Amino acid sequence: MARLSFVSLLSLSLLFGQQAVRAQDYPTAVTLDCKEAMNKLRKAAGLPAFEDAVGDTFVLPAYSHEESRAAPVAETLWKTEICPKVLGGGRSRNVTEAVKLTGNFAYYPVTDGKKECSDAVEYWKGGLSQFNDTIPPTFQALNDPVVYNDRAVSFVALYNPKTSPVVSCVLLQCPNAGVGGRRLAAGTTDAVICLTNPAPLEARSQPFDDEQWKKIVDSLSLSEEEEEKGGVSPVVPSVALISAAVISAFALF
């Protein structure tokens, strides 16, 4: 009986160990509430506050492997379609879930363990530099014109000027894996991703009018002046932040 019990316990231990290893091969997506950090900047620029997004096409779903049976759509979205791009791979050939989402994305590649909403917002507002002090031009598509890279698109998503704007955010953690699922290194590559609606970027349109743009620029200039007076250096994204896991926020899909 004692031997049977020992064997049973050993088998159970191995089973849990295998399950833990398998769980490490799957991403997790934890819902974040970034409204306060985002709305602080938006209020200073005279823009309406973000509210919580509602509805499958507007909400980024939470996900963990333990609950994957109840969330097959979320597993496909994060594991198959989004994480490969976060890890620097190519676009999935069969994209079925990401294309169902609407809106524009703000994407922040986490570095140095800084994964709070405030860290993401500081990174996104740094996208102002992409426009070289001029109002964003007419948008056609990602990188058309060339100024609309991932940093610029994230900036526009943060300052979404549309009426009744909503936002949904997650902290996505993608397991570091290679081709065929081989683990390249322990740990995860993380990103804060927010989806804002209605989409501020539309083909053949400028995202901001002159008045909106002036208020945004003035609010950021005032913010920097206040930080300097308080002895705090304005946050400037590091080279590591700019280069880490660079993907197109607008064309995640």
Curated annotation (Swiss-Prot):
Secretion signal span: 1-23
InterPro entries from the UniProt entry: Surface_antigen (IPR021288)
Maturation propeptide residues: 182-184
Keywords: Disulfide bond, Signal
The keyword Disulfide bond is annotated on this UniProt entry: yes
The keyword ATP-binding is annotated on this UniProt entry: no
Subunit structure, as described in the record: The TA4 antigen is composed of a 17 kDa and a 8 kDa chain, linked by a disulfide bond.
Protein name: Sporulated oocyst TA4 antigen
